[in-house]
């Protein structure tokens, strides 16, 4: 058994919902995305007010992922450009609490996580996973699924500190010794 700090990373480090921010990157460059914007706004609203179940989240993202995402020809280059622009938004408090054994468990997609985790030197992380050919979720790291996925991948881990921006992570809070709720640069210990 080993203890660690766990982060619901990208939303708390950057503020906002990373997949939505990435999709908005295309609003400026690709008019085909505009037909998905109303649905993406609804997703943002529902996520902000914790109005999703896992099944509803999968369904909500499906039309965007299956209708638009799989047709992006420059995805890898676009991810690099996205992080070139957004890496500086990582909140400075993270460097103060960072540990070498940190694990990131995030609802963000693996294709977005891979690049930023490599840049900042985080080796242990897991996120949602999307089949790039079909646009379907292979794994959705959201709500109670986070605990299930975490326990499958790190069966001997004990969570000392858990940092999150959302009460949606109640299931992760329940298995953590200490919980910190993050709002921008403000961190409040709630457990």
Please provide the spans of the model-predicted regions.
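Single conserved hydrophobic/aromatic residue that forms the stacking wall/gate
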Residues: 1-4, 8
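ATP/adenylate-binding site constellation spanning eukaryotic-like Ser/Thr protein kinases
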Residues: 3, 19, 122
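Hydrophobic "anchor" residues
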Residues: 12-14
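A metal-dependent, Asp-based hydrolase signature
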Residues: 16-19, 23, 27-92
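C-terminal cap/substrate-recognition subdomain and adjoining C-terminal extension
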Residues: 77-191
């Amino acid at each position: 058994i080993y203890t660690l700090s766990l982060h619901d990373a990208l939303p708390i480090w950057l503020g906002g919902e990373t997949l939505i921010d990435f999709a908005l990157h295309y609003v400026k460059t690709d008019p085909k995305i505009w037909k998905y914007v109303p649905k993406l706004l609804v997703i943002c609203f529902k996520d902000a007010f914790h109005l999703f179940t896992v099944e509803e989240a999968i369904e909500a993202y499906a039309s965007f992922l299956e209708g638009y995402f799989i047709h992006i020809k420059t995805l890898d280059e676009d991810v690099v450009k996205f992080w070139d622009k957004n890496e500086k938004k990582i909140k400075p408090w993270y460097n103060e609490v960072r540990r070498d054994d940190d694990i990131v468990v995030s609802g963000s997609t693996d294709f977005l996580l891979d690049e930023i985790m490599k840049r900042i030197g985080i080796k242990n992380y897991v996120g949602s996973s999307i089949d790039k050919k079909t646009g379907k979720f292979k794994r959705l790291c959201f709500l109670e699924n986070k605990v299930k996925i975490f326990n499958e991948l790190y069966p001997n881990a004990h969570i000392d500190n858990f940092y999150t921006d959302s009460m949606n992570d109640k299931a992760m809070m329940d298995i953590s010794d200490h919980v910190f709720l993050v709002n921008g640069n403000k961190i409040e210990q709630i457990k």
